[in-house]
Amino acid sequence: MEEKGCKREEVISLLSAYRAEDLHHDHILSSMCTIPHEMAVFVHGMFSATNLGDPGLFPGTTKIEDRLVHSLGELMHHPGAGGYATSGGTESNLQAIRIAKKLKPEIKNPNIVVPASAHFSFDKTCDILGLEMRTVPYGKNYTVDCDKMAEMVDKNTISVSAIAGTTEYGMIDDVERIAKIALENDLFFHVDAAFGGMVIPFLPNPAPFDFEVPGVSSISLDPHKMGMSTIPCGCLLLREPEQFGTLNVDTPYLTVKKECTLAGTRPGADVAGAYAVIKLLGREGFRAVVAGCMENTRRLIEGMEAFGYTRAVDPVMNVATFEAGPVPKGWIVSHTRAGHLRFVVMPHVTRDVIENFLADVAKIN
């Protein structure tokens, strides 16, 4: 830190130069985050000084968090769900598994059973909590093999998980089947819908994946993905709100005396932004956003197949994967662990972006 500060213009110039080094969204085809909605950006500024970690100081912002949780609970077919705004899917998954562990204190060597598609946050969770992670291989279409999942459950298992909108392929595990496994074995069942939670409800005839399925204990979903909020904003929802009490710690010097959240200081700005977008768009607006992304996904697949790129799987949502092949320079495309090209067609990936990409693909084929 320098002894004397700089002029405002110098600071802005410096930061602008760094920002210019960041990649432009019109060439990013691999991210599950997107450009925030302009409403979210505006509202974020309104609430930039708020801290949900001390709710007595910010009762209005706390009410917004409550409304966000209620709105997302309604979307997940359970308006009475308990929940709070997290920093994203990693925190949500960790907290869900913490609860699962707290609910089974008698198990001394606990394990969790997760699909091969599980996000790496489950690895972090098991490392932090000292759990064994049992990974179930894929069945058909890069979804979990439910028969093998049932076989891997034993007396030390505390939870099973499903992924609704897998990170690599955008697929949905058979939540109803896994729920039966959970109920038969008295297990906590967590659905990681960090990506799919704000996509699947807006698809035509969506597969059951949320609290309408008996046996689902918790759901994670991220408004900072397809919800187009500012980053970071996730949400953890519980079927039984009182289970959050297993995580409570005393907070004697705050305006509340107990706290179940992982972070202490929690920004209210992203939460307000997320709620603002939900209020602005409504279900009708989100259906239109998702429909647009799906239409662009189909156009991408059509174009890639015309150049000889074979799709890896028929997508359920706005993720497209293909057998490996050349990618034009300047475009950010990722690869799955199996080596497939992976595209995520977020709201910033417009039809013009798709056509520009396909035009560049044509030049190298």
UniProtKB/Swiss-Prot annotation:
Its EC number is 4.1.1.11, 4.1.1.25. The keyword Protein biosynthesis does not apply. InterPro entries: GrpII_AminoAcid_Decarb, MfnA, PyrdxlP-dep_de-COase, PyrdxlP-dep_Trfase, PyrdxlP-dep_Trfase_major, PyrdxlP-dep_Trfase_small, Pyridoxal-P_BS. PROSITE patterns: DDC_GAD_HDC_YDC (PS00392). It is an enzyme of class 4 (lyase). It comes from the Archaea. Its cofactor is pyridoxal 5'-phosphate. GO terms for biological process: carboxylic acid metabolic process; coenzyme A biosynthetic process; methanofuran biosynthetic process. The keyword Transcription does not apply. Pfam families: Pyridoxal_deC (PF00282). It catalyses: L-tyrosine + H(+) = tyramine + CO2; L-aspartate + H(+) = beta-alanine + CO2. The modification N6-(pyridoxal phosphate)lysine is found at K225. Keywords: Decarboxylase, Lyase, Pyridoxal phosphate. Belongs to the group II decarboxylase family. MfnA subfamily. This is Probable L-tyrosine/L-aspartate decarboxylase. The lineage of its organism: Archaea, Methanobacteriati, Methanobacteriota, Stenosarchaea group, Methanomicrobia. The gene is mfnA.
